[in-house]
């Protein structure tokens, strides 16, 4: 079982963007589901990852990702987030999977995206760094589900080839 931190309402404070947040860990608490788009971006024999500058998991690494804005097409949101966070222009190629966890209001939609332009650079205040890592030599990942997502992606590579 996954240990889910579920703060009680009295433990909430106003977060950096005005939304309620856990006073212990800083995680934003949403009252309704929020859609997050993420990208696995193959590049130079590895995948692009960002080092988080915000909670949860400051200093740990994950995929370029972000919230989908109201009225925004999901694929466009993923392409926007990769550009904002990594300086890379990408085209979303295919769906890797949909992910959700009990006790978490986030619905995570992960795509594979192909680099079409730009320059790899940390271009966003939400990240400390951006790098390409070999699948066999990953840094400390921000979220438990990241390894499962990578496994799903690698498994899907076998069916595409």
Regions found by a protein language model. Give the residues of each.
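Unchanged
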Residues: 68-153, 159-161
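Short glycine/serine/proline-enriched coil/turn segments at secondary-structure junctions
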Residues: 30-31, 57, 102-104
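Acidic, metal-coordinating catalytic segment for phosphate/diphosphate chemistry
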Residues: 3-38
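Conserved Nudix-box catalytic region and its N-terminal flanking loop in Nudix hydrolases
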Residues: 42-84
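Conserved hydrophobic "DFG−1" position in protein kinase catalytic cores
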Residues: 41-42, 49, 113, 132
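Active-site donor-binding loop signature of nucleotide-sugar glycosyltransferases
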Residues: 24, 52, 65, 113, ...
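Conserved beta-strand and immediately adjacent loop positions that scaffold enzyme active sites
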Residues: 38, 46, 129
């Amino acid at each position: 079982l996954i240990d889910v931190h579920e703060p009680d309402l009295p433990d909430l404070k106003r977060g950096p963007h005005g939304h309620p947040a856990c006073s212990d860990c800083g995680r934003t608490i949403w009252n309704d589901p929020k859609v997050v788009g993420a990208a696995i971006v193959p590049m130079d024999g590895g995948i692009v990852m960002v080092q988080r500058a915000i909670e949860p998991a400051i200093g740990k690494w994950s995929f370029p990702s972000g919230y989908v804005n109201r009225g925004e097409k999901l694929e466009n949101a993923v392409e926007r987030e990769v550009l904002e966070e990594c300086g890379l222009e990408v085209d979303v190629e295919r769906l890797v999977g949909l992910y959700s966890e009990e006790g978490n209001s986030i619905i995570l939609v992960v795509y594979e995206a192909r680099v079409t332009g730009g320059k790899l650079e940390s271009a966003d205040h939400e990240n400390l760094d951006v790098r390409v890592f070999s699948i066999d030599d990953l840094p400390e990942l921000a979220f438990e589900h990241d390894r499962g997502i990578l496994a799903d992606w690698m498994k899907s590579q076998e069916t595409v080839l």
